[in-house]
């Protein structure tokens, strides 16, 4: 995830050249807002990110005639319908699992999407997802890797439903040291190891529930871990552009990016209200009020601040519940200091409750 510092990036963005024709040299086309594109080098991308500028790298869309799409129609429940099931699942969520998994993710030198340790960390995460599925014995559940045009791969776990309507919870798995992306130490405990382990624990919670497995979920559930978010939402773009071209019926996507920092003031979630789906946001508020023990406040993070923007841009309703109001986010991200010592695992467990409630209520919803 990225944090704004607009004035600091003005000089950097001024040197970029906008235009549909690719210039000579190693250049990337980025989108800083709807219809606002610029050509930049990889070094310029890194400097812009370090200065807080958010963007989507749309280089792979050249020649595809991409057109932003209106959201897929969805009918979200107006009332909680499965509180007994969800409450029993929440009781089995484990703070110890979150601590163990996040410690392991943080031990890689970095999880940068072009580094060798970025691949090694993805392989480790893939093995954890496989283990959860295998130990559950759930029929039909599977995990697959989705390759990108760079080293690190996406991971998608699927619990098939009886309909083609799909509900997603996702998090980016990569990390970055903004001073030295390829080789620098980037434990990425909060950004975004925290979101990654929350999604993993939500998967454990769903698959570990005999009541859920016996209920035969109506809608297909997917748990995503995206590669290359720090390079401009690269991995999530791979996934959602493919889903768009395939005509997938993604009815809801919940993004978990930054889930462990409690902030200095009142403990609360931040509901991202820009570049998200307002109807789905209202549903998220209902989930938080029912299943979490802390409040939620509206906040904004800017265009393309995280992977929900890839879903939204491709026509899929998306929301993001962040660790705090955006202005109170963790100041240690994108550095060697993004470590577990600054995180609160009780707060992270609240995120897991929300993810579990979101997936279960929508997974069981009829006529979504």
Swiss-Prot record:
Subunit structure, interactors included: Monomer.
Annotated function: Probable extracellular aminopeptidase which contributes to pathogenicity.
Protein's name in the database: Probable leucine aminopeptidase TRV_05750
Which Pfam family, any one, appears in the UniProt record? Answer: Peptidase_M28
Q: Where in the cell is it found?
A: Secreted
Where is Zn(2+) 2 bound in this sequence?
191, 230, 334
Please state which protein family the record places this protein in. Answer: Belongs to the peptidase M28 family. M28E subfamily.
Q: Identify the stretch annotated as signal peptide in this record.
A: 1-18
Is Metal-binding set as a keyword in this record?
A: yes
- Tell me a Gene Ontology molecular-function term this record carries: metalloexopeptidase activity
Task: State where it is primarily located.
Answer: secreted
Q: What does the Swiss-Prot or TrEMBL cofactor note state? A: Binds 2 Zn(2+) ions per subunit.
InterPro entries linked to this entry: M28_fam, Peptidase_M28
Quote the record's binding site residues for Zn(2+) 1: 172, 191, 257
Q: Name one GO cellular component term.
A: extracellular region
Q: Which Gene3D superfamilies match?
A: Zn peptidases
Q: List the disulfide bonds.
A: 301-305
This chain is glycosylated at 92, 192, 216
Q: What organism is this sequence from? A: Trichophyton verrucosum (strain HKI 0517)
């Amino acid at each position: 995830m990225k944090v704004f510092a607009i004035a600091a990036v003005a000089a950097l963005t001024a040197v970029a050249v906008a235009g549909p024709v690719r210039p000579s040299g190693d250049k990337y086309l980025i989108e800083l807002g709807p219809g606002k594109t610029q050509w930049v080098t990889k070094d310029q991308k890194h400097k812009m990110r370090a200065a807080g500028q958010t963007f989507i790298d749309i280089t792979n869309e050249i020649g595809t005639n991409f057109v932003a799409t209106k959201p897929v129609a969805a009918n979200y429940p107006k009332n909680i319908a499965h509180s007994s099931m969800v409450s029993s699942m929440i009781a089995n969520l484990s703070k110890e699992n979150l601590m163990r998994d996040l410690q392991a993710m943080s031990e890689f030198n970095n999880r940068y999407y072009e580094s060798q340790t970025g691949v090694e960390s993805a392989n480790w995460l893939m093995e954890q997802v496989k283990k959860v599925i295998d130990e559950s014995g759930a029929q039909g559940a599977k995990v697959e890797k989705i390759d990108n045009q760079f080293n690190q791969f996406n991971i998608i776990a699927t619990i098939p439903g009886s309909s083609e309507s799909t509900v997603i919870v996702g998090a980016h798995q990569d990390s970055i040291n903004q001073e030295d992306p390829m080789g620098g130490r980037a434990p990425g405990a909060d950004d975004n190891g925290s979101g990654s382990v929350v999604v993993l624990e939500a998967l454990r919670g769903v698959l570990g529930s005999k009541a859920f497995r016996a209920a035969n979920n109506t809608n297909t559930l997917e748990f995503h871990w995206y590669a290359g978010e720090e390079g401009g939402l690269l991995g999530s773009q791979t996934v959602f552009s493919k889903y768009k071209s395939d005509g997938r019926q993604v009815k809801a996507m919940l993004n978990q990016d930054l889930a462990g920092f409690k902030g200095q003031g009142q403990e609360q979630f931040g509901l991202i209200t820009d570049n998200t789906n307002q109807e789905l946001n209202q549903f998220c508020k209902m989930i938080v009020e029912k299943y979490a023990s802390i409040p939620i406040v509206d906040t904004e993070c800017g265009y393309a601040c995280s992977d929900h923007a890839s879903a939204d841009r491709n026509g899929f309703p998306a929301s993001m519940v962040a660790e705090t109001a955006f202005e109170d986010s963790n100041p240690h991200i994108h550095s060697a200091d993004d470590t577990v010592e600054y995180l609160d695992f009780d707060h992270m467990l609240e995120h897991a409750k929300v993810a579990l409630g979101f997936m279960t209520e929508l997974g069981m919803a009829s006529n979504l």
